[in-house]
Protein backbone atom coordinates (compact mmCIF):
# COMPACT_ATOMS: atom_id res chain seq x y z
CA UNK A 1 0.00 0.00 0.00
CA UNK A 2 1.38 3.39 -0.99
CA UNK A 3 -0.03 6.53 0.61
CA UNK A 4 0.89 10.12 -0.26
CA UNK A 5 0.28 12.84 2.31
CA UNK A 6 0.36 16.49 1.23
CA UNK A 7 1.46 18.78 4.05
CA UNK A 8 2.15 22.49 4.28
CA UNK A 9 4.51 24.54 6.41
CA UNK A 10 2.53 27.44 7.89
CA UNK A 11 3.26 30.26 10.33
CA UNK A 12 2.27 29.55 13.92
CA UNK A 13 -1.11 31.28 14.10
CA UNK A 14 -0.63 32.10 17.76
CA UNK A 15 2.24 34.42 16.83
CA UNK A 16 1.06 35.90 13.52
CA UNK A 17 1.18 39.68 13.22
CA UNK A 18 -0.20 41.91 10.48
CA UNK A 19 1.97 44.75 9.15
CA UNK A 20 0.27 48.04 10.08
CA UNK A 21 1.15 49.72 6.77
CA UNK A 22 1.13 46.99 4.11
CA UNK A 23 -1.62 44.91 5.78
CA UNK A 24 0.26 41.73 4.96
CA UNK A 25 1.20 38.87 7.28
CA UNK A 26 4.62 39.44 8.83
CA UNK A 27 6.35 36.07 8.48
CA UNK A 28 9.83 37.19 9.48
CA UNK A 29 10.71 35.86 12.89
CA UNK A 30 7.45 33.90 13.19
CA UNK A 31 7.96 30.19 13.98
CA UNK A 32 6.60 27.72 11.44
CA UNK A 33 4.71 24.51 12.08
CA UNK A 34 3.12 21.73 10.06
CA UNK A 35 -0.46 22.69 9.30
CA UNK A 36 -2.44 21.05 12.14
CA UNK A 37 -5.04 19.40 9.91
CA UNK A 38 -2.21 17.89 7.87
CA UNK A 39 -0.92 16.22 11.03
CA UNK A 40 -4.24 14.40 11.38
CA UNK A 41 -3.94 13.32 7.75
CA UNK A 42 -0.41 12.07 8.40
CA UNK A 43 -1.50 10.14 11.48
CA UNK A 44 -4.33 8.49 9.53
CA UNK A 45 -1.87 7.48 6.81
CA UNK A 46 0.66 6.09 9.28
CA UNK A 47 -2.05 4.11 11.07
CA UNK A 48 -3.14 2.53 7.77
CA UNK A 49 0.47 1.67 6.92
CA UNK A 50 0.96 0.08 10.33
CA UNK A 51 -2.16 -2.00 9.79
CA UNK A 52 -1.78 -2.98 6.15
CA UNK A 53 1.92 -2.47 5.40
CA UNK A 54 3.37 -0.34 2.65
CA UNK A 55 4.91 3.13 2.54
CA UNK A 56 3.95 6.70 3.36
CA UNK A 57 5.38 9.51 1.24
CA UNK A 58 5.00 13.10 2.46
CA UNK A 59 4.94 15.90 -0.12
CA UNK A 60 5.10 19.64 0.31
CA UNK A 61 5.49 22.65 -1.95
CA UNK A 62 7.35 25.63 -0.57
CA UNK A 63 10.69 27.35 -0.08
CA UNK A 64 13.82 25.37 0.83
CA UNK A 65 13.08 26.00 4.51
CA UNK A 66 9.99 23.77 4.18
CA UNK A 67 12.41 20.84 4.40
CA UNK A 68 12.21 21.30 8.18
CA UNK A 69 8.54 20.31 8.17
CA UNK A 70 9.28 17.29 6.00
CA UNK A 71 11.92 16.10 8.43
CA UNK A 72 9.41 16.54 11.23
CA UNK A 73 7.02 14.30 9.30
CA UNK A 74 9.80 11.74 8.93
CA UNK A 75 10.25 11.88 12.70
CA UNK A 76 6.62 10.88 13.10
CA UNK A 77 7.35 7.81 10.99
CA UNK A 78 6.86 8.69 7.32
CA UNK A 79 9.02 6.63 4.96
CA UNK A 80 9.89 9.23 2.34
CA UNK A 81 9.77 13.00 1.88
CA UNK A 82 9.52 15.05 -1.31
CA UNK A 83 10.02 18.82 -1.46
CA UNK A 84 8.67 20.65 -4.49
CA UNK A 85 10.49 23.97 -4.61
CA UNK A 86 11.07 26.45 -7.41
CA UNK A 87 10.88 30.21 -7.83
CA UNK A 88 8.17 29.60 -10.45
CA UNK A 89 5.81 28.49 -7.66
CA UNK A 90 6.04 31.77 -5.71
CA UNK A 91 2.71 33.52 -5.24
CA UNK A 92 0.58 30.51 -6.20
CA UNK A 93 -3.11 30.64 -5.37
CA UNK A 94 -5.07 27.42 -4.88
CA UNK A 95 -5.53 26.83 -8.61
CA UNK A 96 -1.80 27.06 -9.32
CA UNK A 97 -1.00 25.08 -6.17
CA UNK A 98 -3.22 22.17 -7.16
CA UNK A 99 -1.64 22.11 -10.62
CA UNK A 100 1.86 21.83 -9.16
CA UNK A 101 0.96 19.32 -6.44
CA UNK A 102 -1.08 17.11 -8.77
CA UNK A 103 1.87 17.04 -11.17
CA UNK A 104 4.17 16.06 -8.30
CA UNK A 105 1.81 13.29 -7.16
CA UNK A 106 1.88 11.86 -10.69
CA UNK A 107 5.68 11.98 -10.63
CA UNK A 108 5.72 10.24 -7.24
CA UNK A 109 3.52 7.53 -8.71
CA UNK A 110 5.85 7.06 -11.65
CA UNK A 111 8.95 7.02 -9.45
CA UNK A 112 7.88 5.20 -6.28
CA UNK A 113 4.64 3.46 -7.21
CA UNK A 114 1.09 4.64 -7.78
CA UNK A 115 -0.59 5.82 -4.57
CA UNK A 116 -3.66 4.01 -3.28
CA UNK A 117 -4.70 7.02 -1.20
CA UNK A 118 -3.74 10.69 -1.25
CA UNK A 119 -4.33 12.49 2.05
CA UNK A 120 -4.56 16.21 2.78
CA UNK A 121 -5.84 18.16 5.75
CA UNK A 122 -9.29 19.66 5.28
CA UNK A 123 -7.71 23.12 4.95
CA UNK A 124 -4.69 25.18 6.00
CA UNK A 125 -4.79 27.63 8.87
CA UNK A 126 -3.14 30.39 6.82
CA UNK A 127 -5.43 30.21 3.79
CA UNK A 128 -8.59 28.49 5.11
CA UNK A 129 -9.92 27.83 1.60
CA UNK A 130 -10.32 24.02 1.79
CA UNK A 131 -9.83 24.02 -2.00
CA UNK A 132 -6.47 22.32 -2.46
CA UNK A 133 -7.49 18.75 -1.59
CA UNK A 134 -10.54 18.68 -3.90
CA UNK A 135 -8.52 20.50 -6.58
CA UNK A 136 -5.82 17.82 -6.56
CA UNK A 137 -8.49 15.11 -6.75
CA UNK A 138 -10.11 16.80 -9.75
CA UNK A 139 -6.82 17.13 -11.62
CA UNK A 140 -5.86 13.52 -10.93
CA UNK A 141 -9.31 12.12 -11.66
CA UNK A 142 -9.57 10.65 -8.16
CA UNK A 143 -12.72 10.03 -6.18
CA UNK A 144 -12.70 12.28 -3.12
CA UNK A 145 -13.95 11.96 0.44
CA UNK A 146 -13.88 15.29 2.27
CA UNK A 147 -14.23 16.27 5.94
CA UNK A 148 -13.40 12.75 7.07
CA UNK A 149 -13.16 12.19 10.82
CA UNK A 150 -12.36 8.47 10.88
CA UNK A 151 -11.13 5.72 8.57
CA UNK A 152 -13.52 2.88 9.36
CA UNK A 153 -12.21 0.11 7.11
CA UNK A 154 -9.91 -0.56 4.16
CA UNK A 155 -10.35 -3.62 1.95
CA UNK A 156 -7.23 -3.90 -0.19
CA UNK A 157 -8.41 -7.09 -1.88
CA UNK A 158 -11.71 -5.48 -2.83
CA UNK A 159 -10.03 -2.11 -3.49
CA UNK A 160 -12.45 -0.17 -1.31
CA UNK A 161 -12.41 2.13 1.71
CA UNK A 162 -15.10 3.09 4.24
CA UNK A 163 -14.95 6.32 6.23
CA UNK A 164 -16.98 8.39 8.66
CA UNK A 165 -17.59 11.87 7.33
CA UNK A 166 -18.75 14.70 9.56
CA UNK A 167 -21.59 16.83 8.22
CA UNK A 168 -23.93 19.46 9.60
CA UNK A 169 -26.62 16.84 10.14
CA UNK A 170 -24.41 14.34 11.93
CA UNK A 171 -22.06 11.64 10.67
CA UNK A 172 -22.18 9.98 7.26
CA UNK A 173 -20.71 6.54 6.62
CA UNK A 174 -19.37 6.49 3.07
CA UNK A 175 -17.64 3.87 0.97
CA UNK A 176 -15.77 4.28 -2.29
CA UNK A 177 -13.20 2.47 -4.35
CA UNK A 178 -9.46 2.97 -4.37
CA UNK A 179 -7.52 4.99 -5.40
CA UNK A 180 -9.05 8.06 -3.81
CA UNK A 181 -8.23 11.34 -2.09
CA UNK A 182 -9.24 12.07 1.50
CA UNK A 183 -9.26 15.38 3.37
CA UNK A 184 -9.06 14.91 7.13
CA UNK A 185 -10.70 16.78 9.98
CA UNK A 186 -9.54 16.62 13.56
CA UNK A 187 -9.40 12.87 14.10
CA UNK A 188 -10.14 10.85 17.19
CA UNK A 189 -6.69 9.27 16.99
CA UNK A 190 -4.03 11.02 19.01
CA UNK A 191 -1.08 12.17 16.91
CA UNK A 192 1.86 9.94 17.73
CA UNK A 193 5.14 11.14 19.10
CA UNK A 194 8.19 10.18 17.09
CA UNK A 195 10.55 7.70 18.71
CA UNK A 196 14.23 8.49 19.14
CA UNK A 197 15.07 6.04 16.36
CA UNK A 198 12.72 7.91 14.01
CA UNK A 199 14.31 11.24 14.95
CA UNK A 200 17.78 9.90 14.17
CA UNK A 201 16.55 8.41 10.90
CA UNK A 202 14.88 11.69 9.94
CA UNK A 203 18.08 13.63 10.61
CA UNK A 204 20.05 11.34 8.28
CA UNK A 205 17.36 10.87 5.64
CA UNK A 206 17.74 12.30 2.16
CA UNK A 207 14.81 14.52 1.25
CA UNK A 208 13.93 14.26 -2.43
CA UNK A 209 14.01 17.79 -3.86
CA UNK A 210 12.28 18.49 -7.16
CA UNK A 211 12.19 21.66 -9.21
CA UNK A 212 9.28 22.33 -11.54
CA UNK A 213 11.21 20.60 -14.32
CA UNK A 214 12.12 17.62 -12.14
CA UNK A 215 8.47 17.10 -11.21
CA UNK A 216 7.40 17.15 -14.83
CA UNK A 217 5.62 20.51 -14.87
CA UNK A 218 4.95 21.13 -18.55
CA UNK A 219 3.34 24.57 -18.47
CA UNK A 220 5.08 27.11 -16.24
CA UNK A 221 2.40 29.68 -17.09
CA UNK A 222 0.04 27.69 -14.84
CA UNK A 223 2.35 28.15 -11.84
CA UNK A 224 2.94 30.98 -9.38
CA UNK A 225 1.47 34.42 -9.91
CA UNK A 226 1.15 33.88 -13.67
CA UNK A 227 -1.09 30.89 -13.11
CA UNK A 228 -3.10 32.45 -10.30
CA UNK A 229 -6.38 34.14 -11.26
CA UNK A 230 -6.85 35.31 -7.66
CA UNK A 231 -4.64 37.39 -5.39
CA UNK A 232 -4.91 38.43 -1.76
CA UNK A 233 -5.44 42.17 -1.93
CA UNK A 234 -5.43 42.90 1.77
CA UNK A 235 -5.05 41.17 5.12
CA UNK A 236 -6.03 43.01 8.26
CA UNK A 237 -6.64 42.34 11.92
CA UNK A 238 -10.19 43.03 13.12
CA UNK A 239 -10.46 45.97 15.47
CA UNK A 240 -10.98 45.07 19.09
CA UNK A 241 -14.36 45.95 20.55
CA UNK A 242 -14.43 47.18 24.11
CA UNK A 243 -17.25 45.50 26.02
CA UNK A 244 -18.34 46.82 29.40
CA UNK A 245 -18.74 44.07 31.95
CA UNK A 246 -21.24 44.22 34.78
CA UNK A 247 -20.58 42.39 38.01
CA UNK A 248 -23.67 40.75 39.49
CA UNK A 249 -23.71 40.43 43.26
CA UNK A 250 -24.31 36.74 43.85
CA UNK A 251 -24.69 37.37 47.56
CA UNK A 252 -28.23 38.39 46.78
CA UNK A 253 -31.01 36.02 47.73
CA UNK A 254 -32.00 35.56 44.08
CA UNK A 255 -28.83 35.85 41.94
CA UNK A 256 -30.48 34.30 38.89
CA UNK A 257 -33.24 36.91 38.97
CA UNK A 258 -30.64 39.67 39.21
CA UNK A 259 -28.74 38.26 36.24
CA UNK A 260 -31.88 37.90 34.12
CA UNK A 261 -32.96 41.43 34.99
CA UNK A 262 -29.57 42.76 33.87
CA UNK A 263 -29.79 40.82 30.57
CA UNK A 264 -33.28 42.17 29.86
CA UNK A 265 -32.08 45.67 30.71
CA UNK A 266 -29.36 45.37 28.05
CA UNK A 267 -31.54 43.52 25.53
CA UNK A 268 -35.13 44.70 26.02
CA UNK A 269 -36.30 43.06 22.80
CA UNK A 270 -35.19 39.70 24.13
CA UNK A 271 -37.73 39.92 26.96
CA UNK A 272 -40.54 40.61 24.48
CA UNK A 273 -39.42 37.74 22.22
CA UNK A 274 -39.34 35.29 25.12
CA UNK A 275 -42.75 36.44 26.33
CA UNK A 276 -44.19 35.95 22.83
CA UNK A 277 -42.60 32.51 22.64
CA UNK A 278 -44.12 31.58 26.01
CA UNK A 279 -47.58 32.69 24.86
CA UNK A 280 -47.22 30.41 21.86
CA UNK A 281 -46.97 27.42 24.15
From Swiss-Prot:
GO biological process: nitrogen fixation
GO molecular function: electron transfer activity
Keyword Oxidoreductase: no
CDD domains: ETF_beta
Keywords: Electron transport, Nitrogen fixation, Transport
Entry's family note: Belongs to the ETF beta-subunit/FixA family.
Its job: May play a role in a redox process involved in nitrogen fixation.
Name of the molecule in the record: Protein FixA
Organism of origin: Azorhizobium caulinodans (strain ATCC 43989 / DSM 5975 / JCM 20966 / LMG 6465 / NBRC 14845 / NCIMB 13405 / ORS 571)
Annotated gene: fixA
Amino acid sequence: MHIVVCIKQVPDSAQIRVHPVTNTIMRQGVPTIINPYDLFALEAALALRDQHGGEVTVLTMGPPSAEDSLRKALTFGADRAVLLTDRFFAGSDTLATTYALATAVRKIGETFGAPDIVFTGKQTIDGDTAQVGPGIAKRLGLLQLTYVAKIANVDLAGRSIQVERRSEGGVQVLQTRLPCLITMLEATNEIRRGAMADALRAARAEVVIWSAKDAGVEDISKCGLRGSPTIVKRVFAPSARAEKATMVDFSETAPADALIAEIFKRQPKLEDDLAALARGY
